[in-house]
């Protein structure tokens, strides 16, 4: 327990933990003696972050420097998604992905490829014929194999692990009715893993999803993973995306999922991790009352009040204790962005909203 508390204390000193507030940048400039995230957790798990193209290229030099100092694993936020890397059937765009992999290699980092199959940000041509109708099963299998073999093959021996399939299960445990599912059924998932393993037999392969604390989704993921293992299809880890807030998910429920996933024999990875200090978006809010709506969703435009900051830190400490309790099965914790300024939730669902 003392060891855990010392590590958590170190982390808290970094002002913002893995959400990495803007003060993190100032801390990085003050002294080289303070503990880094990767050093503080070196006996527990890899500490990772998502990089955008500006950080990879060095245009955001401070963001890149912070990432290299505090993390030992990186994932491309968007550069390897289908719509970006394979925008047309016979054309690939490699510049951003190549630069990302080189940055990781040059700095001895554990490199994650994200993601090979995802219904969102899928290239518009991928699932349809010249008339805009769904392609047949054999055509999609051929396209899927070519896409995965080309990308994974290009980075064979360089990218250490791949998010092969992303977000294929919905909360009630049914399969998402994506184009991949409509055309190939459940089989598109094991096929994707099979193709990835063919392209690089040494790479780790992951299934990644959000809301993994939800029992319906949890149960189906466990069944799916066990089925693939029984068929001899390689899958190394289950990624729990972990977009958290001050009161969600319930940590007991989250732990139940973590233990269930570990029970498959897979490793568990905390992926796309962030923890918002802002109120949960209320789908029933009166959006016609623009002023009240914006105030409700963006209550701290000038910074977090001290009591909210303290509550956030306490919540973060509880989350980190949970991760460390299960460091025997958790092999990586990846923050979704280097700083609050990089959050995918800034300006959503109202313009000017600041994410903390």
Regions found by a protein language model. Give the residues of each.
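Substrate-binding cleft and catalytic face of glycoside hydrolase catalytic domains
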Residues: 69, 73-87, 96-213, 279-280
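Boundary/entry segment of secreted carbohydrate-active catalytic domains
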Residues: 31-73, 77
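Short, acidic/polar
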Residues: 54-70, 143-151, 217-228, 316-322
